[in-house]
Amino acid sequence: MDQDQHPQYGIPELRQLMKGGGRTTTTTPSTSSHFPSDFFGFNLAPVQPPPHRLHQFTTDQDMGFLPRGIHGLGGGSSTAGNNSNLNASTSGGGVGFSGFLDGGGFGSGVGGDGGGTGRWPRQETLTLLEIRSRLDHKFKEANQKGPLWDEVSRIMSEEHGYQRSGKKCREKFENLYKYYRKTKEGKAGRQDGKHYRFFRQLEALYGDSNNLVSCPNHNTQFMSSALHGFHTQNPMNVTTTTSNIHNVDSVHGFHQSLSLSNNYNSSELELMTSSSEGNDSSSRRKKRSWKAKIKEFIDTNMKRLIERQDVWLEKLTKVIEDKEEQRMMKEEEWRKIEAARIDKEHLFWAKERARMEARDVAVIEALQYLTGKPLIKPLCSSPEERTNGNNEIRNNSETQNENGSDQTMTNNVCVKGSSSCWGEQEILKLMEIRTSMDSTFQEILGGCSDEFLWEEIAAKLIQLGFDQRSALLCKEKWEWISNGMRKEKKQINKKRKDNSSSCGVYYPRNEENPIYNNRESGYNDNDPHQINEQGNVGSSTSNANANANVTTGNPSGAMAASTNCFPFFMGDGDQNLWESYGLRLSKEENQ
């Protein structure tokens, strides 16, 4: 700042002020003279300044330190222990000695040595550090530091009488620690060489105290600022008492006070600078804490999800096992029901077959009763019965030669035995099924093979309770029946004389058949041409027996061969003997 704006002093005035002999002197600033530049330490005499000696004084405020030079300016002697009153009158915004003494000047904001409402005196700061070091083990173990700082505040209030909240204590300690770290790491950037005032206490708490470095150096820039603040724009009246202090000591004491204020201002500025770095470290800790909370939250949710998935998988497995057991039980029950149904169906067809066999036996007995001669059972229900039937047929064909009717019956049974024992009912059912499927056979005529149709016919015969027949046997049987039908129709068309014997196989008759119309047979055993055509129907044994009867002149055998008993069964008129056995003769094919 420009020096012309402040009161100017010369060397004589300064010496007179320093050597005042106990009288009150009023000094009026002069506008013509200035403080010389050598007063600031540039051109002083080469006298080594004594060590800094600070004299403690007591005021209405807290404890403070007054440099010796400033004390001398106040008019009091250090040896006599007299109190001095320094009155400075200012106009505008100037700063006097009173503002410097009560902490409102250069040293008011450094570390809180002032005694105001928001300031921390040195003794209170030392008390805070002592309590904090005493509770250091609790701070290291606790996660939440807030209750511990409340405990520090309570101890300071109860034991030492300082009223500070836990939050203020924590903020003060953080500022002290931040500046301590910067000082220890050499980042404080101090030029006066003064170490931090609370470095020893913090070093005992956080590290070794061997790094204490003190390098005395004067900061001329801040000293000039202090001297500049010492001046005011208006005239200043200073009332002093006499003093026996030398001029050199007074000037050096004043210079020492300026250095002390420089230390205070420097410490305060560095603490304010370090507060921003402390905020950064606090934000980093909060960020790390936030990341840890997020990680813990995700881990907790993942554990819950895995546990829920395990429970769900266990339930799903149990449900699948229960469903599988139910399915197996239902399948087993269905198998039992199906087996029972098949057994019931087999039993039904067995009863039906037994009923049909009983009916056939009744018919045979009726024929035996009417003819008065024994007949051979036409149906063979088992291989043993088939073998026995064939043997009986051979025996009867050899022994029974008395009449032609016996020989005709034998021939009929032999035909049935030679045709793998096809019964009359079985032949009728074969013809019925084949006739019902005639349209299907016509559709595939000239196309694909009809083997599957004959297999279907054989399966239907098995379902009706007959013996198992292959599709080839059914087809051959049908062709054999068809050939016989065609030949019989030819004989009917020729109107031959009726004969008592037939082809040995029951054929369904139509309206053109003379058996129903004229009660005549279309077959003649005496016709050699017809015998040759029906060689598959007749047997060589029956032909030999018939020829033997005719040759030997046995008229009864010849008559028996040429006599038909069908008119006898039909009876005279509208009555017939079939009805007495519950049978009814019909012209339809399926009866």
From Swiss-Prot:
Disruption phenotype annotation: Disrupted perianth development, particularly petal initiation and orientation, sometimes leading to petal fusion.
Segments passing through the bilayer: none
Location of region: Disordered: 1-32, 380-410, 491-551
Residues in Myb-like domain copies: 118-177, 422-479
This protein's UniProt keywords: Developmental protein, DNA-binding, Growth regulation, Nucleus, Repeat, Transcription, Transcription regulation
InterPro entries in alphabetical order: Myb_DNA-bind_4, SANT/Myb
One GO-annotated biological process of the protein: regulation of DNA-templated transcription
Cellular component aspect of the GO annotation: nucleus
Taxonomy, superkingdom: Eukaryota
CDD domains attached to this UniProt entry: GT1 (cd12203)
Localization per Swiss-Prot or TrEMBL: Nucleus
Tissue expression notes: Confined to flowers, at low levels. Also present in 7-days-old seedlings. Barely detectable in other tissues such as young seedlings, roots, stems, leaves and siliques. Expressed in flower primordia, more precisely between newly arisen sepal primordia and also at the basal margins of developing sepals.
Compositional bias of kind Low complexity: 535-551
Compositional bias ranges of the Polar residues kind: 388-410, 515-534
Induction line: Expression within the newly arising sepals is repressed via the PINOID auxin-response pathway.
GO molecular function: DNA binding; DNA-binding transcription factor activity; kinase binding; protein homodimerization activity; transcription cis-regulatory region binding
Pfam assignment, any one: Myb_DNA-bind_4
Principal location class: nucleus
Complexes and interactors: Interacts with KIN10.
Described function: Transcription factor that prevents growth. Regulates perianth architecture in flower, mostly in the second whorl, probably by suppressing growth between initiating sepals, ensuring that they remain separate, and by modulating organ shapes. Required for the establishment of auxin flux.
Protein name (Swiss-Prot/TrEMBL): Trihelix transcription factor PTL
Organism this protein belongs to: Arabidopsis thaliana (Mouse-ear cress)
